[in-house]
A protein has these predicted regions:
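Acidic, metal/ion-coordinating pockets
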Residues: 1-258
Length: 258
């Protein structure tokens, strides 16, 4: 949102950069205690696109670099704003993430169907974690032939099932981010519950929901093979200027995988 960009620019001075570290300074100590930090990066990040706000977002790369300094290493890129800037936005954000340090893991953008069998993996303390992410929609903006990468929609259940089952084979734990549900609603809709159970049955251990901008419930699910899987249907907002009381309350989910 524009007020955040503008304050970051003021804090950086007049050199044309942005200082977002102030946004995360009180959270960084918590992140430092964790082995893994995952976030839904809901806007395109780049060093080339001009910053822009609602309804078509673009965020300075300095924001992602500040998150990196705060301890975030896993970025989910699949959400309703992924296609906001069309083909040029996809190209710019891919270029940006490729320039980030090697220990950064991104998930949710795929370079065509031939890329679908590539499962993003991270090994931490000898434990391998797979990360996948999907979105319910992209605000009516569809992929075009000039886009060099694409999201996978929650309606593409055959693709999702294949990816989750592949991830189950390759990793000790499978974490899935899903951008779903109704904005500004605490109610969990049937499609969320159905997909969550399917993801658990296919092999997901943790399911993290985003998009509603407010908190929704969390619960344990029993998978088809008897495993217990945890789903948080919506963590609410993390950093925004939305001002409704329930939009101001977000959650940071901490889990111990064992």
């Amino acid at each position: 949102h524009a007020p955040i960009y503008k304050q970051a620019a003021r804090r950086a001075g007049e050199d044309g950069t942005y200082s977002f570290d102030y946004c995360y300074e009180h959270i960084a100590p918590l992140y430092a205690e964790q082995d893994v930090n995952w976030i839904n990066q809901e806007t395109l990040c780049s060093d080339t696109l001009a910053p822009s706000t609602y309804p078509s977002f673009s965020t300075p790369g300095d924001c992602a670099r500040a998150l990196y300094r705060a301890g975030v290493r896993v970025f989910s890129l699949s959400n309703n704003h992924t296609y906001d800037k069309g083909a040029s936005g996809i190209a710019a954000t891919l270029q940006f993430w490729e320039s980030m340090p090697e220990d950064v893991v991104t998930t949710g953008l795929w370079r065509g169907e031939e890329d679908y069998d590539r499962i993003p993996l991270q090994t931490v303390n000898g434990v391998t974690i797979a990360y996948l992410s999907y979105t319910e929609h992209t605000n009516g903006i569809r992929q075009n032939k000039n886009m060099t990468a694409n999201v996978i929609y929650t309606s593409q259940t055959d693709v999702i099932e294949r990816q989750v089952r592949l991830a189950r084979q390759q990793a000790d734990f499978v974490v899935v981010g899903v951008h779903w549900g109704v904005e500004d609603s605490h109610a969990i809709v049937d499609s969320q519950r159905t997909l969550a159970q399917n993801l658990a049955d296919w092999g997901a251990d943790v399911i993290v929901g985003t998009h509603p901008h407010v908190l929704q419930d969390a619960q344990w699910l029993t998978a088809a093979d008897g495993r217990r899987s945890f789903v948080a249907f919506s963590l609410g907002n993390f950093l925004s200027t939305q001002s409704r009381p329930d939009q101001l309350v977000g959650a940071i989910l901490t889990l111990q995988l064992q």
